[in-house]
Amino acid sequence: STKMVLANCFDDKGTPSVLPNDYQGQLNLVKSLIAKGHQRIAYLSLSTHLPATTRRIDGYKYALAEAALDFDPSLLVPAEVDVGDGDAGVQLLWDAIDRVMSLPQPPTVICFGNDRMAMRAYGILRSRGIALPDDLSVAGYDGHRMITDTLYPTLASAELPYAAIGIRATELLLGMINGTA
């Protein structure tokens, strides 16, 4: 039979998989932002139907609670931009940014569900006259070096451990093939 291990995804058939710790990644990111003095931290998340989103939101909320910061539901907005969404997806991101930035107490930093969203946000925020990082800080998720290192200012991002996930998936697959897993 065909042996298979999924990396950074899973199915409902119980196929062996290796997943990142999305909870811990978001927790660590938010804790680092709090350590830099941020207290109003918005989170513009990926689609709420994704299990990773639930875990990341839990990490976000726990980091706030651990720092004795109140969770403000108005700072948590789903805003995923799917590649296939076209203009509708871009509009969703614009609307989410406008929503949190027009609050009576706007955030000092916005965390985005992934680095692509954060990259798009740089342009949106600048078009609104918001200076980065003087007026607002931005953080992403994934640690895509092509994005994080290219943007100015550089993007803070929780890094998905792609290499470690690949190595672990390979080890599991080899174990299945050799009958040791």
Model-derived regions, located:
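Bacterial carbohydrate/catabolite-sensing allosteric modules
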Residues: 2-181
